[in-house]
Structures are given as structure tokens and as C-alpha cells.
Regions:
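Active-site rim/loop-helix segments in enzyme catalytic domains that contact anionic ligands
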Residues: 1-123, 145-159, 168, 214-217, ...
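Active-site environment of divalent metal-dependent phosphoester hydrolases
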Residues: 15-18, 133-141, 172
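Active-site rim elements
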Residues: 30-33, 132-135, 195-204
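Short, well-ordered beta-to-alpha junction loops that form the rim of enzyme active sites
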Residues: 60-63, 130-134
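Structural motif
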Residues: 126-127
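Histidine/acidic-residue-rich catalytic or RNA/ligand-binding cores of hydrolases
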Residues: 141-144, 148, 174-180
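Active-site segments of SGNH/GDSL-like serine hydrolases
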Residues: 164-175
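A conserved mid-domain beta-alpha-beta active-site/ligand-binding segment of alpha/beta enzyme cores
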Residues: 175-238
Length: 268
């Protein structure tokens, strides 16, 4: 991080789609619990590589792909779809501060908003980095930004600026196109967007490598690709000359490590 006062708040555990962990002899629920624990650990430990201390990292522990349903029924608990758990406190033991949902552990929208409001009041950020609500279609990403804005409506401390980013697009999950280390083109204009300013800080080769190593610390991005994807890449390499970085096989190593970043700047 280029800021000495960065704080990182992770909303969900990341426990679903844990088939790879079933190879360890675990059933679906146990594999999901293990993956959730590992990704929760990553959310607290990996930021240290970028100079963000654990005391400035918070894991809220809500469950993957449940945020949109939570938003529609704010007082109803929504358990994990795969792990069998329904208590967000299971991955909160290393958090640096107490939060409202620590009282009952219920995975509800009301608890999520209260947690986020408490975090905002504690860290008093001037800038919030959150997924772009119009560009990034991932349901949890859209709901995450909605939750952040609802929490801001309840806090005395008011962040002034949103930095918005997109990990996915509605019609193209290969964006940004091209190999790692290259630039990032603006995504296709499929529909009208708010007239936000752009901020595109550059990353030199050393920072790009540091970012790649930060990605490599994430358990979810480790391991070999499935055979089908390996064969597809071999064909693409031979016929289209495509290349993937040596830093990691997951697509994020190609998409996320570029010579500059791209953020949409929205004033509140």
C-alpha cells in the first residue's frame, strides 16, 4: 500500500466452491469450512506483504453469495450454502476490534450494516475502495457496495470519496485483455455510466512483482489448473500465441498485474 493509514475490511469468508479441498478426504461441508478458514486467514495475513498491519485488517465472516438475499430480508439470518455454518464469529477471533455482530453472530444484513458503520467510525477513512456498482455484475460485489453506502448513511464520520474498481464485466470475464504487465483499456461502453473521473496510478516492475506475490499468497489462487483449462491454454498458445505469466497459473495473475491500475473516482 502507498498509504500509511490503509485499513482492509473483508465482508465474506470465501468458503464456497471448495471441491479442491475434498481431495483431502473431506466432505463438502468440511471442505467449505476449511476453505473459509484459510481465506479468512489470507485476508488478515496477506496484507502484511503490502505493509498493512493485522491491526488494520478486519474479517466480517459473512457467507458467499448470500449478501443479495440478506439485503432483501435484513433481519433474517442467511447461513452458508455449503459449510453448514450460521455464525460469523467462527472466523473473527483475530479481528483487532469488537463489532456489533460479535454479540450474536447472526449473518443478517442489519448486522452487516452495523459492523460496517462501526468500522467506518473506528478507522475514519477519507476514501473508500469498493467494487463499481454499475460495471461489476458479481452479485456479492454489487451488494457489498450497497452495504457500504447504507453504512455511511448511519455514521457521523463521512468519507468523501469512493474509488471504484471492477474485477468482472457483464459480457467479458477476460477483461482487461492482453498479457500481464501491459496496460488496461477502458471497458466497453455497454450502457451509460455516471460521469466519474478516472485515476490510473502507475506500477513499476518491482511493484508489479510485489502485487503478483501478494496474489500468490492467496490460497484460492494456488494450485494447478484443471486438465481442461490446461489443454485450452496449450491450444491458445500454439494457435493464437497467447502467453501467461510465470508468477502464477490463475487468470488473476494475467488480469490484475498491469503497469497501471484503473479506478473510477466518485465524490459523495
Amino acid at each position: 500500500s502507498r498509504s500509511s493509514e490503509t485499513a482492509i475490511v473483508t465482508l465474506t469468508q470465501g468458503e464456497i466452491e471448495a471441491q479442491g479441498y475434498q481431495r483431502l478426504g473431506l466432505d463438502q461441508a468440511a471442505a467449505a469450512r476449511l476453505k473459509g478458514r484459510l481465506r479468512a486467514w489470507d485476508s488478515l495475513a496477506a496484507p502484511l506483504w503490502g505493509g498493512v498491519a493485522q491491526a488494520r485488517c478486519v474479517q466480517l465472516g459473512y457467507y458467499c453469495l448470500q449478501l443479495p438475499a440478506m439485503a432483501e430480508q435484513p433481519q433474517t439470518p442467511f447461513a452458508s450454502r455449503e459449510s453448514g455454518e450460521c455464525d460469523v464469529r467462527s472466523v473473527r477471533r483475530h479481528n483487532p476490534l469488537s463489532l456489533p455482530a460479535d454479540a450474536d453472530g447472526q449473518p443478517t444484513w442489519d448486522n452487516l450494516i452495523a459492523d460496517l458503520a462501526a468500522v467506518i467510525e473506528h478507522y475514519r477513512p477519507e476514501v473508500l475502495l469498493t467494487p463499481h456498482p454499475e460495471l461489476d455484475p458479481h452479485h456479492d460485489h454489487v451488494a457489498s457496495t450497497r452495504a457500504v453506502l447504507e453504512a455511511c448513511a448511519q455514521t457521523r464520520w463521512q468519507p468523501q470519496t469512493l474509488l471504484l474498481y471492477a474485477n468482472h464485466l457483464h459480457d467479458n470475464d477476460r477483461w482487461p485483455m492482453g498479457p500481464a504487465g501491459m496496460g488496461i483499456a477502458l471497458p466497453p461502453a455497454i450502457s451509460a455510466l455516471p460521469a466519474d473521473r478516472l485515476w490510473s496510478p502507475s506500477l513499476d516492475a518491482e511493484r508489479q512483482l510485489d502485487k503478483a506475490m501478494a496474489l500468490a499468497l492467496q490460497h484460492d489462487l494456488q494450485g494447478a489448473l484443471p486438465l481442461k483449462k490446461r489443454l485450452r491454454r496449450l491450444i491458445q498458445r500454439l494457435l493464437a500465441g497467447r502467453r501467461w505469466p510465470a508468477t502464477g497459473e490463475d487468470e488473476f495473475f494475467r488480469k490484475a498485474v498491469r503497469r497501471h491500475e484503473l479506478f473510477w473516482v466518485r465524490q459523495r
